[in-house]
Every structure is written in structure tokens, then in C-alpha cells.
């Protein structure tokens, strides 16, 4: 089953070419709903996503090859294709390292390139990660200022509330870049197929989570 990644950039930030005062007024939240096919909003009730599309940009999918979770998410973090950043699949053997990469037990030595949270931290901009691929281990000796080890049992609404809480932290520890990963509707799509009613129901649930996040963020 080929599933692609839906990614939302919910706010804007510039890391260079701006004064420190301007930089501290800007935020970006990158939310990936894994396996979110580009046609899902046309087939499910997604008023929040629809409203964002009207004021932003909606694009066709542009996956890296292979179009699976870990290579694509690390490509988004680094701006590199999988053959340049090292994660060429969710599970693979690397002869140069004589080691096997597994999603359930990833090895830090596989992660090449510079993820965007490292770029931010180098420039004095705190970053946070909620389950984003590559953030659980130091890369080039760095991690996001705030990060969470993956735990699929954490309710989606709690994840949204955590991101809002991060954006309310005191300025000296507040992240201005948040990378936020949700493992659905990929998981349900693999179990029930992407065209199933269960998958579309999950898409609608995620739209409600996004609406909850926007409501909490706007009132904070």
C-alpha cells in the first residue's frame, strides 16, 4: 500500500536575514499526519483543513523515494533525499556500518545531514519535537531543546495541548520551531486499506484535533 505524508506548516519563521527582535516574534509549527493522502479532504469531512487550504497552499504529494515514513520525515527535517541523509528505508542493512536499522530500535549513527532543529538551535532559536523522526537521539551532538520519545498511547488532544503549552513557555525557553508527528491515518490505512470508512473516520478525527489545536492556540 502506498501512503503519502500530509504536512501542514501552521505559521511562519525566518532563521536568517532578520534581526533578533523580529526573530523572536515568529513561530512555525510543522505537523505531519503520516499516510495522509492528498485526496482525503475531498472524500471526508475536514472543515479545518479546508479552511487552512483557502488561506494557504494545497499541493499534490511530493514524496521522496521510497515513499515510507522514516525516509520521508527525515527528508523533511534535513532537506536531503534519503540516499544523501542515510535513512533509505524503515528497515535496512547498511554494509558500511555493518548494522541493521530498525524503526523500533533506531541507531543514531545512521542519521546524516543536519536536521532543521539543529539549524535553529545553532542560531539561538529553541526547537521542540513531538515524535519527529530523528529527534530522539543526538545528531552532531545536538537535539531539540524539547523532545518526546515516541508513545502511540498519548491521546491526540493531549499532544495538541502539549504543543500549545510549549508555545506559552517563558520566552527564554519557548520553542519557536515545533516539529509534530502523528502516526495516523497511516496505521489505520495499513490495517483497513486507505479507501476504507475506518480510515476516513480517522481523517475526520484528526481534523477535529487540528481544530482543537487552532482554537487553543488562538485563545492562548
Predicted regions and their residues:
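Bacterial N-terminal signal peptides
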Residues: 2-13
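Extracellular/periplasmic catalytic domains that process cell-envelope and extracellular macromolecules
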Residues: 21-25, 43, 67-69, 121-122, ...
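Mature N-terminal segment immediately following signal peptide/propeptide cleavage
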Residues: 23-41, 58
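Metal-dependent active-site segment of extracytoplasmic phospho-/sulfohydrolases and closely related
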Residues: 30, 48, 205-220
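A residue-level signal for conserved active-site and pocket-lining positions in enzyme catalytic cores
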Residues: 34, 76, 120, 180, ...
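Short, structured active-site-proximal loop/turn typified by the sulfatase FGly-forming signature C/S-X-P-X-R
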Residues: 39-84
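His/Asp/Glu-rich, glycine-adjacent segments
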Residues: 81-196, 202-205
Amino acid at each position: 500500500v502506498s501512503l503519502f505524508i500530509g504536512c501542514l506548516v501552521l505559521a511562519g519563521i525566518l532563521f536568517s536575514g532578520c534581526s533578533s527582535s523580529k526573530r523572536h516574534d515568529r513561530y512555525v509549527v510543522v505537523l505531519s499526519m503520516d499516510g495522509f493522502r492528498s485526496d482525503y479532504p475531498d472524500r471526508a469531512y475536514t472543515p479545518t483543513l479546508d479552511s487552512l487550504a483557502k488561506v494557504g497552499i494545497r499541493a499534490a504529494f511530493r514524496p521522496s523515494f521510497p515513499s515510507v515514513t522514516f525516509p520521508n520525515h527525515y527528508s523533511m527535517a534535513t532537506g536531503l533525499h534519503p540516499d544523501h541523509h542515510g535513512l533509505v528505508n524503515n528497515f535496512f542493512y547498511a554494509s558500511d556500518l555493518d548494522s541493521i536499522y530498525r524503526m523500533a530500535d533506531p541507531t543514531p549513527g545512521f542519521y546524516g545531514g543536519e536536521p532543521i532543529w539543529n539549524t535553529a538551535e545553532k542560531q539561538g532559536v529553541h526547537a521542540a519535537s513531538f515524535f519527529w523522526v530523528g529527534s530522539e537521539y543526538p545528531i552532531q551532538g545536538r537535539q531539540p531543546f524539547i523532545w518526546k520519545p515516541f508513545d502511540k498511547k498519548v491521546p491526540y488532544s493531549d499532544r495538541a495541548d502539549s504543543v500549545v503549552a510549549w508555545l506559552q513557555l517563558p520566552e527564554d525557553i519557548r520553542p519557536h520551531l515545533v516539529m509534530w508527528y502523528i502516526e495516523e491515518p497511516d496505521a489505520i490505512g495499513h490495517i483497513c486499506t486507505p479507501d476504507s470508512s475506518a480510515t476516513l473516520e480517522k481523517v475526520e478525527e484528526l481534523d477535529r484535533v487540528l481544530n482543537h489545536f487552532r482554537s487553543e492556540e488562538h485563545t492562548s
